[in-house]
Amino acid sequence: MKRLVSDQMVEYLERRNVEYIFGLCGHTVIAFLDALSRSKKLRYISFRNEQLAAMAADGYARIKKKAGVVLCHLGPGIMNTVTGVANASFDSIPMVVIAGDVPSYYFGKHPHQEVNLHSDASQYEILKPIVKRAWRVDDAEAMPEILDKAFRLAESGRPGPVLISVPMDVFSAKIDEELFNRTYKDSPETIKPALAPSAAKAIAKKLIEAQNPVIHAGGGILLAGASEELKALVEFLDIPVSRTLMGQGCISDTHPLMLGQTGFWGLEFTHKFTANADVILGLGTRFAEADSSSWYPGV
C-alpha cells in the first residue's frame, strides 16, 4: 500500500527509538511536522534559531549516546545550523540533520530562498565539508534507504553528523510501505571499529616490556560506552591513566590510577608523570592541541 513519505519517516524514527527532534518550523517541512503531530512517541522541540537546535541535538547525543535529530527549513535555516553541526563533527557526535528544500519541480527557477550559486538546489553543499555524508533526495522512493543509511553512518565507526536535504514535494509523495519495511529488519544495528588481533598482540607486548607505561584516554571512550572496559583494563594491568578534556568521566577522577587531565588545563603532576612514560597507549583520542599543550615536547 502506498502511504505518505512523511508519515513513514515518523514511523521509522519511532522504531529507531528517537525521542526528540530539535528544530524550527518552515514551509518546506510542514508535511513532516504534520506527520510528527500525530506521533505519540516523538516530541518536537522548537527553537528560535536553528543554531540552538543543532547544539541541543549535539548535547542530547552526548548524553544519550545516540544520534540527535535536527529538522530545519531551507536556505537561511540550514545555514544557521553550521556552527552546531561543525561542533558535532569535530567532537565526533552523531547527528542526523533533515533539511527541507525547494520543491523539485522548481529546481533552477530561482524560487524563494533556493541555494543555487553553483548549481540548482545545492544547499546540501553548505554542510558537505563538515558532515560524514550529505544526500539530496531526488527520488521519493530512495528516502527509506537514505534515511536508514544516514543513521547507520552517523552512529558507526567514528560518529558524526550527516545531512539529508529533502525537496518539499518529497515529504508529500506517496511510496509503497514495503520500501520502508525492508529497513526495519536490522536498522538498529551499527558497525563499530575493531582492533585486529595482531595489533592487539603488538600493543600488549609493548606494554609488558615498558618500564613506565601510561594509558591516555579521550572522549572516544565515552562515545563507545567503554568506560567499564577501560576501568577493567587499567586495573588488570595496574597501569596509570591520564585523560583529555573530552575524556572527563571515562574513569572517575578519584580512581587511584587516574593521573588527571593533560594539556592546556592539565595538572603539573600529570605532565611530569606522562613526560617520564616510555610507552603511552592512546585510546579514543586524537592527541589534539589542547590536550598536548600544542604538542610541546615532554607533555
PLM segments and residue spans:
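N-terminal alpha/beta PP-like core and its mobile active-site loop of ThDP/TPP-dependent enzymes
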Residues: 1-299
